[in-house]
Regions:
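Membrane-embedded alpha-helical signal segments
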Residues: 1-166
Length: 166
């Protein structure tokens, strides 16, 4: 399935595909760029905060309507990052977001802008020193819930994985 030029339709399609209301680590940040409704989708813990802040600054400072002509023109002139792709296939967008990329949809664009701003937690999951098991995965989680979730999301890139706060 491909995206449309209508923001509300695209927003609903991606929210359903990503199951946005079912996981607290999936961020759907609605913003306005040059008077157009837009939304950023990303997984908390898998994106670099500094890069997101810089990108958001650029988005809020867009003042030329001609940059909003197409996603390609917008990307070329307004996305201050090297690793960027314009994608209109919903499955590719979902895969990108679940693998740590940031997706931007903008009203009037029939494609999303994928920004590779991913970062992975600093350590690998290790087998715990105590409670060793003979079979199965040798993963141990011990940091904050966001870090633990990022480690799990890094391995399981499935929109059916839902996480609710307890």
């Amino acid at each position: 399935m491909n995206l449309y030029t209508d923001y509300k339709t695209n927003y609903q399609i991606l929210n359903e595909a990503l199951r946005a209301s079912h996981s607290f680590d999936l961020v759907c940040r609605q913003i306005t760029i040059q008077k157009r409704k837009s939304c950023l989708y990303f997984i908390d813990g898998l994106v670099k905060d500094e890069i997101m802040e810089k990108i958001m600054e650029f988005f809020f400072s867009v003042d030329d309507e001609s940059f909003m002509e197409s996603p390609y023109v917008f990307t070329e002139n307004c996305v201050p990052y090297v690793e960027v792709d314009v994608v209109n296939n919903v499955d590719k967008i979902v895969t990108g977001v679940l693998s740590g990329m940031c997706a931007l949809i903008v009203d009037g664009f029939s494609a999303a802008i994928l920004i590779d701003s991913r970062t992975y937690p600093q350590r690998q999951t290790d087998e715990p020193e105590k409670d060793k098991v003979k079979r199965g995965p040798k993963d141990g989680l011990g940091e904050t819930p966001v870090s633990n979730l990022a480690l799990v999301r890094r391995r399981i890139r499935d929109p059916k994985l839902t996480v609710k706060p307890y």
